[in-house]
A protein has these predicted regions:
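Catalytic domains of riboflavin
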Residues: 1-250
């Protein structure tokens, strides 16, 4: 906030306490700000402003990347504020397409690297890469937001809770997290940096479409990624369908 205001990057922080001694939140903070004539802003508002007015990522390097599916270019991006790295895998002359085939994929170490059968993430990534290679054009945006945004440590803890009978949503809540904490603002900015504005999105998650549109991208169509369930992930996939709204076409 200080930098955005054109000031030195420094400040003072203090917690505002409620009458019962707990930290004030939401409506209590709104009332406090009005009473004392203070400015107030939500973190979500700041993120929304930054995503629309300023670039949150910068491209670091681009290399050729031969893969088992075909030849791609790999673009390395870095977050301006957190230095987190993200990737974009591009194929062909995608800018000549009226609508670019795109997969925005969130990191899943266990699925993408170790081919875990507990989820469908690795299969979705492999299928999307093959689809884009066969299309001779498209983009995979690979976002470093493991475990639907809760991080690898908490994801493994959530897995342990699932072994005790909780589903993936219940496990997140038991650990104190929302079911899905992923943010697609960085992904949208990577796509914009690559010159893309109209997308044909490879996804089973309609909320992802809403998120990308919310960051100024036009979704022309959705193509499902059809993955055959197995004994290990069938309950997980059903939870994604019932509780998270995923469209699991068969």
């Amino acid at each position: 906030l200080a930098v955005l205001a054109g000031l030195q990057p420094s400040g003072v922080i203090c917690e505002i306490m409620a009458d019962d001694g707990t930290m004030a939140r939401g409506e209590e903070l709104e009332l406090f700000s009005k009473k004392h004539n203070l400015k107030i802003i939500a973190i979500s508002e700041l993120i929304n402003y930054l995503s629309k007015k300023r670039s949150l990522v910068k491209k670091i390097e681009t290399i050729n990347l031969p893969t088992k599916s075909g030849i791609f270019e790999l673009h390395l991006y870095e977050g301006i504020f957190d230095n987190q790295t993200h990737l974009a895998l591009t194929k062909g002359d995608f800018l000549s397409s009226d609508s670019v085939m795109v997969r925005v994929h969130s990191e899943c170490l266990t699925g993408d690297i170790f081919h875990s059968l507990r989820c469908d993430c690795g299969n979705q990534l492999d299928t999307a890469i093959d689809m884009i290679n066969n299309n001779n054009s498209g983009i995979i945006v690979y976002l470093r937001q493991e475990g639907r945004g809760i991080g690898l440590k908490h994801k493994i803890k959530a897995y342990k809770l699932q072994e005790k009978g909780l589903d993936t949503v219940q496990a997140n809540k038991e650990l104190g997290f929302e079911p899905d904490l992923r943010d697609y603002g960085i992904g949208a900015q990577i796509l914009k940096d690559l010159g893309v504005s109209k997308l044909t999105v490879l996804t089973n998650n309609p909320k992802k479409l809403v998120a990308l549109e919310g960051h100024g991208l036009e979704i022309t169509s959705r193509i499902p990624i059809i993955i055959e369930p197995n004994e290990e992930n069938k309950n997980y996939l059903n939870t994604k369908k019932v509780k998270l709204g995923h469209i699991l076409d068969s």
